[in-house]
Each structure stands twice: as C-alpha cells, then as structure tokens.
C-alpha cells in the first residue's frame, strides 16, 4: 500500500490478522447525506427528486381557493448565497443560512365559462425565509453557536401486532391487539377483551366494537361474516339432514354418529375422536355428503339469513344461533338449505361473530354517528358531519399519510407481495389487519417484537427539517386560502398572497429549540464525531425517560452491526441514547443496515451487501474471525454463526454471509479502546464515554498503544486541515498554508492555488482551545486527502486525546486509596497535562431610559492602577495578564439624581462641581479566574460612531484579507509567467522591447524585462501571440476578480452590525486560561479506570527502577480485579515494549549506525512479529531516517478490537526491546532507597485528563444573594451559594448536644435577617457576640398554616 504524507513519517505497527475487506466509511455521512437530500441544492427543475423541500412543497401545493376560482401552484425553488461564511457567523452571532426563493404560479379561472377556462396566469418568485445550511462537518451555526441535530430512532409507521403479556386480566389470559401507526394522522387500534370480542379505538379514545368500524365502511353483517368465516352447508330432505363434507374441518371433533364411506364401511365409529388418519381415509374414499342428526345444528350460528321459500319472510337473521324453536320454524317452512359459520375452539374462534352480537348499530349511518360521538363527545351529530369526520380520519391524503415506509411495512406484515401503494387506508387494509389479528388469536402467526430494529427506523436531520417545514407550509396554506378569493378582484400578485413568517418561525424553532437540536459537544474531535453519530429514542414523537421500560433500553440481537451495544450514557438515559456502529448506514426507508460479505458454497467472496435487520433474519451469518484457507474457504467443521437472531453453530456449506470486520459491532468510541475484548462491558461503557470528556492537552501525544482507528477519526472529524487537491507547498507559516495545485488537478480558468487559513486559539463550545498547527514544510509534495495541519487533540493526523505515562501498579502510602491517583511532579513540570481554556466575556452597552451607557476609560472613583491595562477607548489590550477583579472593559451607566450625603453637599458647596452622575458598571474578570487576553472583538450598531479600537481591529482584518488575496495573485501570476517562459524561450520574435526582428528569445533576455513588458513582445508564431494575449487578459481578469472580492469583504466589515434592540455596542474579550494538573482533577485511562489526583509528589520521592528512571503515576492494583478491565494491564505491557523499542532506535541513531542496520531492525519490529506486514522497501533512506527519528519516543502500535495482539506477541515485543517478558520489574522507594519486596508491573498507559477540573468546582461563599421567600442563602457555584446544612447534619449536632452551634446554624448563619445584619456589624466592630432572632422560614411556615384556614398566633410571654 502507498503511505500518505503523514503515515510514512510514523508507521503504526498493526497486530491485526484479518484482511481489510472494506474501508471504514466516512463517519459523518449520515448527517451530510441526509441534509443534502433535503436541500437538493444545485438541482435543476428536471433533476428534483420527490424528497426534502421539494416533497414538502408538492404535498401542500396547489392551494385552491374556497370558491375554486383561483389556484396557486408550485413551480420550483432555488437557494441563494449565504451572507456570511461560517467563521463570520460564529463571530457575529448570526445563523449560517441561505435565502429560499420559491417560484409560484397564480392561476385565475373564468367564472362564466363552464369548463373552467383560464382567465389569467401570473408567475413570480417569492421569498420564503432563510434555511440554515450545514457546514462541511455536519453541524449548523445557529445564532453564532455550533449545534448538532441528533438522529431519532422511532417506531416505524406500519401495522404492529402485540399482546398485553397477561397483565390486564387476573387470569393471565393473553389479550391480543393490532395497531396501525401512520407517519402522520390518527392511530387505529384493534384489541381483544377478556370475553374474546374485538374492539376498536381511534387515537386512544373510548373503545367501540370493531364491527362498528366495519359497518361505517359500508359492510353489512353478512358481508362481514363472509369475509371472516367459511360456511358449512346443510341440505334438508324431508327427515334427513345432509352436511356438505369438507373432511379437514372434522379434525379434532368427536364423531356423533358412525361415519361411513360410499360402500357402507365404517371409517370412524361413534364416540371416537377424528384424527388426521381418519381424514386421509375420508378423502381417499371421496365422501362428500354426511348424514347428521338434526340436533347437530343446535348452537351453530347462521351465516345467511333464512328466508321462507313461499312468502319471502325472513325467519332468522344471519348471525343468529340456532335453537330448537328456530329449527322447528325452519322445518315447518320447508327450507331446503341452511348455511352456518364454520368455527371451532382450536383454530377458528367465533370472535367476529360474538362482536357483532354486542354491536348495537345496524346500518352505516348509525355506525358513523357512533364514531362521531366517540370522537366529538357532546356535539350533536349530523349525517354530513359524521361522514366528513370519518372520511378525514383515514381516507384523506391531507390528514393521513402512512408514507412509503409505512405502506411497505404494512403490506409486508399482512402478507402482500407489492410494497408500494397509497398513503391512505382502504377498506381492504382494515379487513386484512383484522383477519391477521384474528389469525394470531387463533394461533396462526406470532406477535411483533417492537424493539426489533426492523420495526424502528431512524429519522435524520433532513427528514425532521422537512417535517417542520411542512408544518410551517400548512400554516401558510390556511392564510393563503383566505386571500386567494380576493386575488382575482384586487389583482394581487403571488407575493401579496404568501406570508413566509410561519415557515421561517417553524424552521427557526426546530433548529433553535427542538429537543434534538443540541449544543455541540466540542471537547475534542471524538466527542464531535460521536455527537453527530448519536441516535436518540427521545424527542418529539419518541419515548420519554419516565415511560421507557427495561425492554426498550436493552441490547437487542438486531443491534449487531447497527447500534453499539457498549456506548450509551450512564444514568436515566441509559439505552435510550445510542451510537451508530462503525459501518452502519441507513437505507432509503430509514432502517439501519450493516454490511456483509457474500458466501457461496462455503467460499467467501469480496462482494459486499448491506442488509437491514428484516432482510438478514433468514441468512446464516458467520463472524469476521471465522478461519479461512488461502482460497478463502471456510475450513472449520462447525462455524459460529447468527441465524434468526440467535447465536448457534452450523456447517460451512449452510453459511450465506460473513461479517466484514470484527469492529463492525461497536461504535467509533468503543473501537478506540485497545484490548476491548479483555474488558468487562460496564467498564468499556465508561471508557468510551470518558474518552469524549478528555480535554485537549497543550502538546498532543499520540497513543503508543492504539487500535488503528485514530487516523480515521482525526481525518473525518474536520478538526485537521486536509488537502482538497494535491500539489506543492508554496509557503507555510503558523496561520496559513498555501498549496500550488498540481497541473493535472487544476480546472481550466481557475487559479490553481489553495489557501488554507488555520484556526488559531479559538474558543470551542466547551471553552477548550481550538488551535491548528501546520505539519508540512515549504516545497513538500502532498497528495489529495493528506493532512496539512493538526487540530486540537491530533498528533500527525492521528487522534491523541491524552498522554503516554509511565505507570506502576502498587499501593503507595495510601495515596492511591479508593482509585486515587498519585502523580509525579515531573508531569507538572513538563506540562504533560496542561490545558488551555478560553473564556468569552461580553460587555454590552445599552440605551437606557436615563441616557446611553458609554464604553470609556474615564471611570469615576477608580485609581490609575486599575486602568493601566486599558487603551484610550477603555478596552483591555491584547496580551494583558489579568487577575480576578481587573477591569476588562470600562463602562459607565447614567444614574438618576440621588439624595446627596452631607459630605457631598459640602464638597459641592466648596468646589462648585457637579458630582458625577454616572455609576461604574465595567466588565471585570470573574472570581477565581486569571489569564491572558488573546482577542478582543467590538461590534457597533449602524449609525453609532466607531471607537479607535474598533477601527484598528478592522484595519488588521483588512490587512489579513489583502495579504491572502495578494498571495493568491502572486502565485497565479507566477504560474502564468512560468508557462509563458516555457513557450517563449527559443522561439523567434518579430519585435519587442530592445529586440531585433528574428531574434531567438533567451532566459536572460526575459529575466531582464519587467513582467509587464513581456506582453509587448510580437512573436513570429501567431499561436504564441494569441497565448500572450490570453495570458494578459487572464491576469487582468484575475486582478479585477480579487479586487472585487476585497471590496466585498471590506463592505461586510464596515457595515454596522445587526445587534439586538436597545444595544449600542458589544465588546467581547477572550481570555486564555492555562490550567496545570493539580490535586482534585479527574483523570482516566481508556478502560473505564477513572480516578482523582490525590497528591503530586516530588520526582525524587517516586518509585524508580534499577536505572534510576522514576515512574510518573502510581495506580492502585486493587482497581483491576474486581472491575475486570484487564485490558489496561495488557496495554501497560505493550506500551512498555513500544517505549523500549523507541529507546533502542534512539540509541542506534545516537551511535550513528548505518541506515541498513536501522532498516533491518525496523523490519524485525514491523514484519517478524505477528500482524500485518509493512512495505518498508518503498521508503528511501532519508524517509527511513525521518521515520526512525519520529519513533524515538516509542513505536506506536495498533491492536484493533477483537483482532488485537496476542499474549505471545506482547512477550515477543518485550523480548525484542530487551525487557523482561513478564512486564514486571524491581522498583526502589525514592524516599528510602530500599527495594520493594516484589516485582511490580510497570509500563506505559495512555491517560486522559477529563473536563471535570477542580478549578471549575472549587467554591467558597462570603456574603452573597439570598432566596426571596425563605431568605436563606442560595446553593451552587453559579449562584455564589453556600453549603447546605441539611436535615442529617442537624441530627449530628443534636446528637452532640451542641445547642449553641445548632442555634447559630439555624438563625444568623441562615435566615434570621436582622440577626445576621447585626452580627455582621458586630464582627466589623470586633465584638463576636450574637443575638438570634426569628428565622424567616418560621414566618413562612406560619403563613402556610394560615393559608390552610387555621388561625395561628404567636404569643409573647
């Protein structure tokens, strides 16, 4: 394989044994593809597909007026250009969106003409609000903050059959039910009651017999019975009764008479039970009629009304039970034929027949009225109202839609072959659902499993945005209908009809405040990717935490390869929020699919198919780790497989599919845990969750022991700068990389220059620091997709969340009791876990009633010292080191005339000066914060004069833009002249500056000319003259284009900012805060092994080995056995080997060994011990040296999940590094110098510092705010609250009998208002006595008792 620019600089030793059949897909595809389909940007009218915005418009338009004389049709739409780019939107706090313009056609019909002749057509583009655009990383910028729309896992539309698990009725009888769930519209439920009658509910309302619904559909009793039951036909001839025999129906019955064949031979004797053997004999004998006694009919139900043959009078209605009296009537009337329903107790129950018996309605109208009463109780029903309501419930496309998914699921479930059909229900649909439900009750068929991923589908961003958009359009439709009637009389245009506000509001509400639109988790690249790949069962139309039971949250067999069984939050959301598996994707219906390799006759092919949970059920699927021979055939006698959602073993020839990779089961975060297969699942869950909380360290350090997924995550997360096209690095500095694109990738007529501006020290959503560092040097050749610059938490294009630390597992003076972590001071000195946090502080100057607030350095009653960090505009300068309480932005607010104190009156009388009428409301650094000002932004309202600071910032930005554009022009110009030089040198000239006719042009001549003079050359070859003219035109066009671009940017910068009403100016100050690691910070490994730093010890006190190398971290060995995450120990061993090999390479370099020796040693590491072989021969000697230099700190290794390093390979690596194979060594106590009793496990573990820092949690209250009602101090750091002295603490003081302490706690330290004021004064005066008064909460108690109407008085003694 060819190595990329960064890969060949540091190759990871890969221990995987299984071949890569399929690359890991682009990890953000689920977000980007979904929204791309929603927008269909750039599609022409013909190319529009029936999805997304287009589908929403088509479903609402055409809108026809109430009179029918005017219609508004939809023609198409187009999206404009965004006003600001992503970075500008974040800075200005606006939404990154594009205007949507819709072309509509207003048609007015001629009233007079009978055939609706068209009188007038008007077409116009109408502005329909802004649609947020997705950034290239799958996020949205809404009001300046980066947000993610999480996909939702909801119940698929369709029909579901279920039972109550015996919980409803005391007997434990299973009551079956069916539910038709549409994509939008009313739910329809059918359910059995304990008496085996079928009922129907619409939208979970009161239940009605199911036959009421069937009657409302227009079915008569007889048609209903015919639909559900077969009939037995009896012929009466005089005194004999003959049954038309269907032998199968006799099965299981007891013969009431001898059953004989045609020859009189008895087949079944009277009193015997009829078996399958008897039925076979009857069929063979061809018995078609059976004589039965008359009482055989008693208790049977009539299927067709019995009519008197002579008079036509109805003797018995259908669905009546035959009794002796009825039989007598029938005999008297000489009826010759009776049809009865065929029912039995085993597989054909009389459920529908029984339901009809309890149904009070007898015709369609009564049934409709009954339904109307149930839906609209209390309203008087009319025939029209009842018909309209019923028609709109399930049969109107506007109110009801199953959607393509729903129709597909519906048809499949009730056994139809076609999967397409209308979105509304039909009579047949309802009958088929009832038939299936009755069949399930009869024991034919099974109920559905609602947690099966074939019954749950994923709604992605695009679909949810489309639904919201449709909601907005429906609101618009109502208003348009009203106005359409006026359109013709008043000559209105489409623009006057459509008010786009409801659409814009619906979209804004969805992106701004929907439960699934979340503030992006931006701690590190992994947390960004995981957030975008999250699938939530919560949200609108989903579950709620309280209602979700255990089953929904549990891991289901169909999760395999679709949803990660490990990664889910701990706490109330466990199992409701999941993460997509690595290779999973959604199909066109929204069901999750997983890829498999096709297996034919036990030969594994390279063909890959994606299957949903339903499609895979019938397949026999082998695991990715199944043993294959060289030809790719399965060799084991029995292969471990999945079949029908069960894990079993089968013969190789039965296998039809095979997993593509062992990591297809888990999510991205879980696949980053090395030796995951050796960790307990609970700890792996914590491990994958805690990696998302790692704070990017100052210097990222790649993991020595990784899994090989690190590069994919870093590349796909979008935090790195990836080359869009290949080429040569033209120039590079800390803030930009300029690439001159290779000729074969340049499109005609464009510059062939890619400028990548790097993000420097920017604040993330979690206040961590986003900073990019270039990896390339001038002159380097890069290919498309190579990584040009590292972002936060990435090291040479690999994800690097933490640091490799030398750890020892041993108890140490109790400092690592209960998961505490003991650190060496060296870790702090080397800034291994130092992180930078950036805080944004905002100062807003408003227009108040008393006058405008002013941002100024002239602040009353503030000394010089406090102002020495401000410039003349009153804003802190960049680079200032500030402490808590320092002024960042000086601001004064006018205050009203106040009563003057006597002193002020005196001063005013003496000096005659008016005391300042403004108060100081400056922005100060919050308590507990100190840092460096790294950036200041000033936003000024239109029409408000800009201060000097705003102008200098603007000038800086313009200079930067100008520099960019000049650079681009310089390269374009250079490239053009290079091409010209190649063409001109050696060609003959007709004339030119200081040139004779017919002279050959040389390099020296061209070098002596100014570039502008080149175009004055006249060449003998006309083609060259044409080339010169084209080049001149191209360069001047380019110059003009870049000047226009500059003017455009300049206009944007100089226009006033769109600020909230009443705001004149906003100043944003960005503080960079450096946080070193300290006791109280939380740290963790990748295996769920978390702990809190308890102590930082001097280096000389830490345990060290025989060479004198001290360890960095001492961990408690008791944290491993009970938690069963042994992966951390294996990681430690392999990490030791990796580091040892690095040191060995380092020694070879220092001894300046030959390259051949280095190559040989590298070959031993990469190709002789297990795993994948690396092709080191394709690297030149210089590249081998560069690789060796990068491996000095340790040889990075990859042990992919479920396919990682084996124990023997770890031992071989340790041996190669000249280290003990046990991974243990003798340590010495740094304090005493004595050797410890036993060998200790020492090695390198990858440790993370989590975003739970003691600085953010530590808090102490002096005097602060009090709660309004109880007058007690508030709680929590955000409110500057106190420590709660709760019920249990009171018990403790009571137990000690500490009466005075208790009194102080309950009064002056809490809510005795007068007492605490007096106490404060006393302490100021140096008097430490206290007088306790009445606590405010006691007054509250009295008031509450009085509110109950109880008169209560306090008596004074």
Swiss-Prot record:
Subunit and interaction comment: The RNAP catalytic core consists of 2 alpha, 1 beta, 1 beta' and 1 omega subunit. When a sigma factor is associated with the core the holoenzyme is formed, which can initiate transcription.
GO molecular function terms attached to this record: DNA binding; DNA-directed RNA polymerase activity; ribonucleoside binding
Provide this UniProt record's keywords sorted from A to Z.
Answer: DNA-directed RNA polymerase, Nucleotidyltransferase, Transcription, Transferase
- Which domain of life does the protein's organism represent? Bacteria
UniProt organism field = Pseudomonas aeruginosa (strain LESB58)
Give the EC number.
2.7.7.6
PROSITE patterns annotated for this entry? RNA_POL_BETA
Family classification: Belongs to the RNA polymerase beta chain family.
Instruction: Give me the gene this protein comes from.
Output: rpoB
According to its UniProt entry, what is the function of this protein?
DNA-dependent RNA polymerase catalyzes the transcription of DNA into RNA using the four ribonucleoside triphosphates as substrates.
Question: What is the name of the protein in this document?
Answer: DNA-directed RNA polymerase subunit beta
